[in-house]
Amino acid sequence: MSESIQVIDSVHSQEIPIVDGIGNAKVVVWPGTGARHRTFQVINLGENSKTVQLCHPESDAAYYVLKGQGSVFDIGTGQSHDLGEGGMVHIDAKDRYQFVASASGMDLLGGPCPADISLYAGLKT
């Protein structure tokens, strides 16, 4: 794909199976859309839902809380950090983490950078 500006419809984006409970995770910007240096997933966590445990061996990750409240759990240290609308979180490469929504649910935008190709196994390009 040539370098260009793209407008990507997240509504019709493919899903990746990283949500445990109510919700979904849609891949919006990833190597399958031509992105080489960045990824974005829209993660919708319903009431008291969570992601599976995540870890990116060669990628940092950053997320922005679009809506709702919850926490990010650092599996390595056992610490939980509260998150709310407008909050951001940065996770170093190799750190294991999990997002947990409160009763209000939580929507996030973000992902690993550079891409963690293992997240996209089985997706159509």
Predicted regions: what they are:
Residues H37-R38, Y64, S71, L83, ...:
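General detector of folded, globular domains
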Residues M1-T39, V52-Q53, L119-T125:
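A short, N-terminal "cap"/entry segment at the start of jelly-roll beta-barrel domains
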Residues G84-E85, A93-L119:
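Ligand-binding loop in jelly-roll beta-barrel domains
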